[in-house]
Amino acid sequence: MADLWPSATPAGAVRFARGTRDLQTCRDFYGGLLRLPLLFEFDADNEDGIAGVIFGVPDASLTLEFIQAEMTHDGDPHDQLVLYLPDAESLDIVARRLIEAGVRTRTQYAYWEQRGARTFSDPDGRALVLAPWIFGVDDVPTPTGAGD
């Protein structure tokens, strides 16, 4: 997949940033429950007056940033974060940890359901999809239950 990056845009890393209503709860969820590596955190004592955390997903070339923000909407069903896990066993381990912590599952698109994924809500109500394959590395699983 690395050789697919366009030479006309030679970016060295990508960061996705999202607002969160409760930075500490978000930090506990992504860092504690999902165990994403916390790369950096900053408090509101900066030029922008914004506090936040940055997680590596799965390394420093792709990062996920959350900042404390006034959320003006509850998002929509297309606002998803998908974590591609190496296999069904890894998915079960992470899903069990989320369920035991009281994280609720949510209705997911048929695409994910038919391919063995599980969908949860993050602290801000956004969809977190756990998929049991690595996109771009593994073949996408054949849909199950479609037309059975």
Ranges and model annotations:
Residues A8, A17-S61:
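Core segments of cupin and vicinal oxygen chelate
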Residues D45, D87, I134:
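Flexible, active-site-proximal loop/turn residues at the rims of small-molecule/cofactor binding pockets
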Residues L64-I67, V129-A131:
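Conserved beta-strand in the GNAT
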Residues A2-W5, I67-M71:
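Short beta-strand/turn micro-motifs at beta-sheet edges
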Residues Q68-H73, I134-G136:
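A short, sequence-level motif marking secondary-structure junctions
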Residues A44-E47, T72-H73, A110-E113:
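A short beta-turn/loop motif at secondary-structure boundaries
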Residues M1-T9, G12-D22, V53-P58, T72-D148, ...:
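Vicinal oxygen chelate
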